[in-house]
A protein has these predicted regions:
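Beta-rich interaction/scaffold domains
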Residues: 1-81
Length: 81
């Protein structure tokens, strides 16, 4: 893999924040409330998988993964109804 620039790493971290927000909002009922359960579940599952992949990257330095790890835990425990 090509080494990432600091800007690319920052963009990846920002994208992780977007996934965290979406997972939390779907679970709280603040996003996708009008979508069916299967679509909400798929959204949470995809974003949780994205976070799991990104947290495992070896290029992070002092970025906090607390919110990402919490969203992963919440996403893995989520069952849409």
């Amino acid at each position: 893999m090509t080494d990432l620039t600091a800007e690319q790493i920052a963009q990846n971290y920002s994208a992780m924040g977007d996934s965290v927000a979406l997972i939390n909002d779907v679970i709280a009922g603040n996003a996708m409330a009008d979508d069916d359960a299967a679509d909400r579940q798929d959204c949470v599952d995809r974003n949780t998988q994205h976070l799991e992949l990104m947290v495992a990257k070896d290029y992070w330095t002092d970025e906090s993964m607390t919110a990402a790890n919490a969203a992963i835990t919440a996403g893995n425990g989520y069952t849409a109804s």
